[in-house]
Curated annotation (Swiss-Prot):
It comes from Debaryomyces hansenii (strain ATCC 36239 / CBS 767 / BCRC 21394 / JCM 1990 / NBRC 0083 / IGC 2968) (Yeast). Its EC number is 5.6.2.3. One of its GO terms (molecular function) is iron-sulfur cluster binding. Residues 12-410 form the Helicase ATP-binding domain. It holds the Pfam family Helicase_C_2. Gene3D superfamilies: P-loop containing nucleotide triphosphate hydrolases. This is ATP-dependent DNA helicase CHL1. Its cofactor is [4Fe-4S] cluster. A motif (DEAH box) lies at residues 352-355. It comes from the Eukaryota.
Length: 820
């Protein structure tokens, strides 16, 4: 362990042990985070990408945690049983308990020291591979696709009486407890840090950032390692050679559980109950994982070396862990947290990239299904039933037939309403109407949903149909839909009062949608149980949506908001709202944006800008459709020809498989000495999130219009109605209800703007100019919803900038950069 001479001291002289000399804005951010944790607050933090947000989160939260452990964990931890004992006896007893806990923690650190010095993870000894008896092909073809016998409630034996949704997981968790070792890990601190982000790559980046840090020990006279456990789905951590190759997470989950329940083909990697050798390997896995910071890939390699399942073995160390990194879905779903045995009580919850949190929560608890999808599911179920009807027990046969009946009822409901023209886009569906005039209401949907979850029939049928697809080239589009019907029935069984069923019409397709409209109730359980919840992101503005729709029950004084500036010098950024050119006003609203004269003058204005701007420029359009409209007008008027004479033009493809090549070509063009390029992108497309346009890749960023979502989409119609009804239910007027709905709609748009233009400045020496093309960017209301670091650099407040002034300032800006 290195020397902890930190050069980072906050305004209150608190050490944060930052690995580098922090900037003032980083210290301010760390102070704000520390304060939110210390005072049990909700935190909303905006820190632009490139300002060291992740390290600031790590350093402030870990500093607080180590101080808390030192001051609280190793004090009086138990009360004396007898109230009659003298006070000095009680204190002596409590001190003994605290010292004993501290000694155990110190012993474990020494064990990790020894492991670190004597074990190379790449050379860890492994068990000899077991010889697995291979079934004959015809046996595999039949037996592997048949579920275990299924029994109704009245026939349940002891096996099914205890078979709750998470029973398989809970059983496995008990397997990794193992016998007591000489040196067991210990952590009596009730507080943990849960760091959650959207993608696997973002969580890996967090692991790498965490690896750069070390913190003052909460123990006496001995360094203390950071105890870190990254969690992931089976798709990332399964090491079974066959199951790990399945295409989707649902298939992998069901295949794993199915293999564990099999009496013939159990998984050789699963920790074995009451097996000393297996328990020792699980403990070795856990201990080795704590010798240093490991990411998901490291744990996968370690599991392979030890021939033990990393998905389950990583749980061995959860109790001693200080920081847990996990994807959104694992944190946000109560059923998943229960299955993983994750206790978030009194913990610090950090959600990164939280600008899309409202959408993520809604999408997790939302589902849609079409008539064609139901037809495909029904065909697969019938095909499977005909094949295996003689080999299925009565419970399986009856439930599959009930499921077929249910799918047919749903399909007929959609078809009959479509033909009669009764459907209005976004209209609510009353669930009782679905079964009106049918015998479908006699089917117990709750029991069907139970059957789908317990029997893993979706995986069985998918596996069988996939085998047919591989061997007989039978096209089968419905495989993933079997998991979709499971989710749909769950919503149908337990429709939340915070959500609604409604109609959606897209082209010729009609679907029944269920959408969670109020995410605050789902999120309330996390807020209630955690010590504090911190939402962080590079573009969190406008923040009002979080207070209004995620924390409406939290008093304003309990919510700490902080939006920090950028680390770049003030002179490295300019922002120009542009409202017109050649006496043609720019307003790219839905009813005005196809005006050919405006599109032509837009091209001329952009030509002026690119002639004054070195290197690359990224232009963001509101949609692929509008980008194509503009390109057609520009081609017809030879504007493309004029633009190409100045810079090479690259266009974002709608096909995601082609994005990487376009980006590579754009990048190499800008990095050459003789050429530069223009990249035409789409807000919400592949290039507006997660891709960094630093340095010569984006000396200019141009935003065309305000990218409002489709107000006529079924989702937005349902959401607008919900906001208006909720406002009126709380005593608001109809006028206030309409304003609230409009603000929500506007905020979706402005978050997308902030996310896109935030791609340009990526580090302290970077510089760029942002051009906002639309006269609406001149209004105070829109300008106030820009990210703080963008808003403070607006060249004109409350109005647009004269275009001649824009060109003059652009030329001066880059002239200074070339001279400097």
């Amino acid at each position: 362990m290195g020397n902890l001479e930190a050069n980072d001291v906050g305004n209150n002289s608190r050490k944060y042990n930052h690995p580098f000399e922090p900037y003032d804005i980083q210290i301010q951010l760390m102070d704000a985070i520390y304060d939110a944790i210390d005072n049990y607050k909700i935190g909303l933090f905006e820190s632009p990408t490139g300002t060291g947000k992740t390290l600031s989160l790590i350093c402030s939260s870990m500093t607080w945690l180590r101080e808390y452990k030192k001051n609280s964990t190793f004090r009086e931890t138990e009360d004396s049983e007898s109230e009659d004992e003298p006070e000095w006896v009680k204190q002596a007893y409590q001190k003994t308990i605290a010292n004993r806990t501290k000694v155990r923690a110190q012993e474990y650190e020494r064990l990790l020291d020894d492991l670190s010095e004597n074990y190379d993870v790449s050379k860890v000894s492994v068990l000899p591979e077991k010889k697995v008896k291979r079934q004959k092909p015809e046996q595999e073809q039949d037996e592997n696709f048949i579920p275990a016998d299924y029994y109704s409630d009245s026939e349940l034996d002891s096996k099914y009486e205890n078979d709750k949704l998470t029973s398989e997981i809970n059983e496995l968790l008990s397997r990794v407890d193992g016998p007591k070792e000489t040196v067991e890990p210990v952590n009596d601190c009730p507080v943990k840090i849960f760091f959650s982000s959207r993608t696997h790559s973002q969580l890996s980046q967090f692991s790498h950032q965490l690896n750069m840090t070390e913190f003052e020990s909460s123990l006496d006279n001995i360094p203390e390692r950071i105890k870190f456990s990254p969690l992931a789905s089976r798709k990332q951590l399964c090491i079974h050679p066959k199951i790990s190759k399945l295409s989707n997470v649902s298939s992998i989950n069901d295949a794993c559980i199915d293999l564990q329940q099999s009496s013939k083909n159990s998984c050789e990697y699963i920790p074995k109950l009451h097996n000393t050798q297996s328990e020792e390997i699980v403990k070795k896995f856990s201990d080795l994982s704590f010798t240093k910071i490991h990411d998901i890939e490291d744990l996968g390699k370690l599991g392979n070396k030890l021939k033990i399942c990393p998905y389950y073995s990583v749980r061995k160390g959860i109790d001693v862990t200080e920081i847990i990194a996990l994807p959104y879905q694992m944190l946000l779903q109560d059923s998943t947290r229960s299955a993983l045995n994750l206790n978030i009580d009194d913990s610090i919850i950090i959600i990164d990239e939280a600008h899309n949190l409202l959408d993520v929560i809604s999408s997790i608890y939302s589902v849609s299904i079409t008539s064609n999808e139901l037809s495909d599911i029904t065909k697969s179920l019938k095909f499977y039933l005909n094949k295996f009807i003689k080999r299925l027990n009565s419970g399986n046969r009856i439930n599959i037939m009930k499921l077929i009946k249910l799918c047919q009822v749903l399909e007929k409901f959609i078809s009959s309403n479509s033909k009669d023209g009764k459907i209005k886009h976004g209209d609510e569906i009353i669930t009782s109407d679905i079964f009106e005039g049918t015998t479908g209401d006699l089917v117990n949907i709750h029991k069907i949903e139970q059957f789908l979850n317990k029997s893993k029939i979706a995986y069985k049928i998918e596996s069988y149909m996939q085998k047919l697809n591989d061997s007989e080239s039978i096209k089968n589009r419905s495989n993933p839909l079997l998991f979709k019907i499971t989710k749909f029935l769950k919503c149908l069984t337990n429709p939340s009062k915070e959500g609604k069923f409604f109609w959606d019409k897209t082209n010729d397709s009609v679907s029944i949608n269920y959408m969670l409209l109020d995410p605050s109730e789902i999120f309330r359980d996390i807020v209630k149980r955690a010590r504090c919840v911190l939402l962080c992101g590079g573009t969190m503005e406008p923040m009002n949506d979080y207070t209004n729709y995620l924390f409406p029950y939290i008093p304003p004084e309990q919510i700490k908001k902080f939006s920090c500036g950028h680390i770049i010098p003030q002179e490295n950024l300019e922002v120009f709202p542009i409202g017109n050119y050649n006496d043609i006003s720019f307003e790219f609203s839905f009813d005005k944006r196809n005006n050919s004269k405006m599109i032509i003058e837009l091209g001329h204005a952009i030509l002026n800008i690119i002639e004054s701007t070195p290197d690359g420029i990224v232009i963001f359009f509101p949609s692929y459709k509008y980008l194509n409209v503009v390109m057609n007008v520009w081609r017809q008027n030879k504007i493309i020809e004029s633009l190409t004479k100045v810079k090479a033009i690259f266009q974002e493809p709608e096909d995601s498989s082609k994005v990487e090549k376009v980006l590579n070509d754009y990048s190499s063009t800008n990095k050459s000495e003789k050429h530069s390029a223009l990249l035409l992108s789409v807000v919400g497309g592949k290039m507006s999130e997660g891709i960094n346009f630093s340095d010569e890749l984006a000396r200019g960023v141009i935003m065309i219009g305000l990218p409002f979502p489709n107000i006529f989409s079924a989702e937005l119609i349902a959401k607008r109605k919900f906001i208006e009804e909720s406002t009126i239910a709380k005593g608001g007027t109809k006028s206030q209800a309409m304003v609230n709905a409009k603000n929500f709609y506007e905020n979706i748009c402005m978050r997308a703007v902030n996310q896109s233009i935030g791609r340009s400045i990526r580090h302290k020496n970077d510089y760029s100019i942002i051009y906002l093309f639309d006269q609406r960017y001149g209004s105070d209301k829109i300008q106030d919803k820009l990210s703080g670091w963008v808003k403070q650099k607006l060249f004109t407040r409350g109005r647009c900038t004269d275009f001649n002034q824009v060109i003059k300032e652009t030329q001066d800006f880059f002239r200074q950069k070339l001279l400097g």
